[in-house]
Regions:
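An alpha-helical, amphipathic repeat domain used for nucleic-acid recognition
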Residues: 1-168
Length: 168
């Protein structure tokens, strides 16, 4: 099958078909669909029309997309608020929609502690300083703030390695 060149005329509704194909893989935000369809060479007017049709059919919903993304990143992957907000911004979710979705994320300190507890048991009890540094680095890389990460790591290591001295 030949690939269609970008400058050739496309059949009416091709943008909508492509968008449906993208949505069949996973939920996407309005901005993400717009970017992908324009990059594929579709006319901006056709892209806008296709996305509006999909929104009216309930297949494109930024609020639902944001809630799903927050649930995935915050609850299942145990990511911090900064990482989740960054992901929402990268997907083109509006700030007000992102803020509403973030309300359901739960307590960031609890998520940081859950992540730290999950990993603390794997660390060597003979080297508490190294264990703290490794655990702290992991928690911060997941998007938690330094103070939240510090407290979560200290508590998780106290529980996992009670005989070790607490790092400074």
């Amino acid at each position: 099958m030949k690939k269609q060149r970008r400058d050739q005329a496309r059949p009416r509704g091709a943008a909508k078909e492509r968008a449906l194909g993208l949505l069949a893989v996973r939920w996407r935000s309005r901005a993400e669909l717009d970017r992908r369809l324009r990059r594929a060479g579709f006319d901006p007017e056709e892209v806008g029309s296709a996305i509006e049709d999909l929104e009216s059919a309930g297949l494109v919903d930024d609020a639902r997309f944001a809630r799903e993304l927050v649930a995935d990143r915050a609850d299942r992957r145990l990511a911090g608020d900064r990482a989740v907000r960054y992901a929402l911004r990268a997907k083109g979710v509006a700030e007000d929609v992102a803020a509403q979705a973030m309300e359901a994320a739960g307590d960031e300190a609890e998520r940081a502690l859950a992540l730290a507890r999950k990993r603390a048991g794997r660390l060597a009890p003979s080297e508490p300083e190294a264990a703290y540094r490794r655990l702290y680095g992991l928690v911060v890389r997941r998007g938690f703030g330094p103070s939240v990460a510090r407290e979560a790591c200290r508590q998780a290591l106290r529980e996992a390695l009670p005989e070790a001295e607490e790092p400074d």
